[in-house]
């Protein structure tokens, strides 16, 4: 089912930048970012078959994908790279030098090195890598801009860096990690070292941390009176979180600061294994 959410025309300009989540969670991640002329994937942490099926559900053909942008080398972000690059021999893979060290043996495609803070263009989409704080080798998130509309994807970070925060403030659509509930994590059956890793500055964002960050974003946001930003909660843990808990916690944090979902910001949660709506940015 192909659903376009949000606005298709902003200030008299046709908006073509759009986003769809094919999978988002600790078991696998893959996102579609596209315009009418350029088709990108961010991460390939699920099977090539599921990627192709997800793209079809979003009205996009696998053969139209021009580039894969990889955030880091963890399995839930790169599991499908080998079959994907085998099936698309002309695919370009963008990642940092640190990430490439871990995935080059699995990747038959052309590699293009990126670095945080150094923007580049793919077709009519400007891509802006930024630093994440995660237990990986040179991980990055990505912000995308086309025709003045901005989408930022930030997951797998123990905290929001200043660089990332500035990009969020400028974004029309925010894909933001809301990985775990701290209390649920502390009392789950994970080994102590795993809990400590997740809660560290090199782990993942909790529901409460995400709520606080959204308040800061709204404090500084530059949106006009006729527009509210949209946030999509991403990378939820299957074991230590669920959508209703994430949304309730974040709403509570925001309301304590005078911000309300539906009035100041639109919010939805991305599924771990179901293709999302297609969002106009």
Regions found by a protein language model. Give the residues of each.
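Structured catalytic core of nucleotide-sugar glycosyltransferases
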Residues: 21-30, 71-77, 81, 91-93, ...
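Conserved beta-strand hairpin/beta-sheet module of binuclear metal-dependent hydrolase folds
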Residues: 2-58, 139-156, 173
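Cap/insert and terminal regions of metallo-dependent hydrolase folds
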Residues: 163-266
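Metal-dependent catalytic neighborhoods of phosphoester/phosphodiester hydrolases
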Residues: 79-88, 104-106, 241-245
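Active-site neighborhood of phospho(di)ester-bond hydrolases with catalytic His/Asp-centered motifs
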Residues: 41-45, 65-73, 94-97, 152-156, ...
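Active-site metal-binding motif and surrounding structural segment of the metallo-beta-lactamase
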Residues: 48-95
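Metallo-beta-lactamase
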Residues: 95-149
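Active-site environment of divalent metal-dependent phosphoester hydrolases
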Residues: 27, 75-78, 100-102, 137, ...
């Amino acid at each position: 089912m192909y659903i376009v959410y949000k606005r298709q025309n902003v200030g008299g300009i046709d908006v073509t930048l759009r986003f769809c989540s094919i999978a988002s969670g600790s078991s696998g991640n893959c996102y579609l970012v596209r315009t009418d002329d350029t088709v990108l994937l961010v991460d390939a942490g699920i099977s090539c078959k599921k990627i192709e099926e997800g793209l079809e559900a979003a009205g996009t053909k696998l053969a139209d994908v021009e580039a894969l942008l990889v955030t880091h080398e963890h399995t839930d972000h790169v599991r499908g790279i080998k079959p994907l690059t085998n099936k698309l021999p002309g695919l370009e893979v963008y990642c940092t030098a640190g990430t490439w060290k871990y995935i080059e043996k699995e990747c038959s495609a052309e590699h293009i090195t990126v670095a945080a803070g150094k923007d580049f263009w793919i077709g009519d989409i400007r891509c802006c890598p930024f630093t994440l704080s995660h237990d990986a080798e040179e991980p990055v998130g990505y912000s995308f801009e086309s025709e003045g509309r901005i989408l930022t994807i930030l997951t797998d970070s123990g905290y929001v860096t200043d660089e990332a925060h500035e990009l969020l403030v400028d974004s029309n659509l925010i894909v933001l990690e809301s990985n775990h509930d701290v209390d649920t994590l502390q009392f789950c059956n994970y080994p102590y070292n795993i809990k400590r890793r997740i809660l560290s500055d090199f782990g993942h964002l909790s529901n409460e941390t995400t709520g606080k960050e959204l308040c800061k974003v709204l404090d500084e946001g530059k949106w006009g009176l006729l527009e509210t930003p949209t946030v999509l909660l991403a990378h939820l843990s299957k074991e230590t979180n669920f959508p209703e808990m994430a949304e309730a916690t974040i709403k509570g944090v925001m309301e304590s600061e005078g911000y309300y979902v539906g009035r100041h910001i639109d919010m939805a949660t991305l599924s771990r294994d179901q293709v999302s709506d297609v969002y106009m940015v």
